[in-house]
Amino acid sequence: MTDTPTKQENQSKTENPPSSNANEQRRGNRNNDRKRNRRGDSKNERDSEWQERVVQIRRVSKTVKGGKKMSFRAIVVVGNEKGQVGVGVGKAGDVIGAVRKGVSDGKKHLVRVPLTPNNSIPTLSKGRDGAANVLIRPAAPGTGVIAGGSIRTVLELAGIKNVLAKRLGSKTPLNNARAAMVALSQLRTHKSASRERGISLEQLYS
């Protein structure tokens, strides 16, 4: 036989509401949840600014003691189309993991590109990586991106809309992409070039 609560016990329960400390703790938890949501939203906004394109996915093998270990290698170009671009390489046992590592590696090797008002580059530039040589030069508005392969991908994700590019030597996508990155990293605005050389803009153009 179970004991039923008396009227006095019921009255004491109703007369004693939850303490104010418990209410304050709930409010604090809600505030912390809101702060976490804001931080998550700002991170998602930053991530949404970046675009990634897979240039190449290859199946590679590594000889180990027990035989051959198969994996995937992904070449990924990352950029925000606002003057920042990077090339990354990722290896993993599956394609998704290789692409994810390539994106992370590309964001670690970003290059800032000076853009002109017509979304071109200020001067001619050359880049080399291994046996690949890349030449890029500015173009007039309306020209578009005259390039091919991985070089075109790098230039587009950098935010360049009018440019001429020429590939010399190796046709390897990774070497060409890295050569284009070298060429972009050597670009300087006219003001910075005159400042580095210690001359005025008039002397630079003359």
Curated annotation (Swiss-Prot):
* Any single GO CC term annotated in Swiss-Prot or TrEMBL for this entry: small ribosomal subunit
Q: Which UniProt keywords apply?
A: Ribonucleoprotein, Ribosomal protein, RNA-binding, rRNA-binding
Q: Where is the composition biased (Basic and acidic residues)?
A: 24-52
Organism the protein comes from: Prochlorococcus marinus subsp. pastoris (strain CCMP1986 / NIES-2087 / MED4)
Coiled-coil intervals, chain numbering:
none
Share an example GO biological-process annotation for this protein.
Answer: translation
* Superkingdom, taxonomy of origin: Bacteria
**Similarity comment: family membership:** Belongs to the universal ribosomal protein uS5 family.
**Domain comment, as recorded:** The N-terminal domain interacts with the head of the 30S subunit; the C-terminal domain interacts with the body and contacts protein S4. The interaction surface between S4 and S5 is involved in control of translational fidelity.
State what protein this is by name. Small ribosomal subunit protein uS5
What's its job?
A: With S4 and S12 plays an important role in translational accuracy. Located at the back of the 30S subunit body where it stabilizes the conformation of the head with respect to the body.
Q: Which GO terms describe its molecular function?
A: rRNA binding; structural constituent of ribosome
Keyword presence, Ubl conjugation: no
Polar residues biased stretches = 1-23
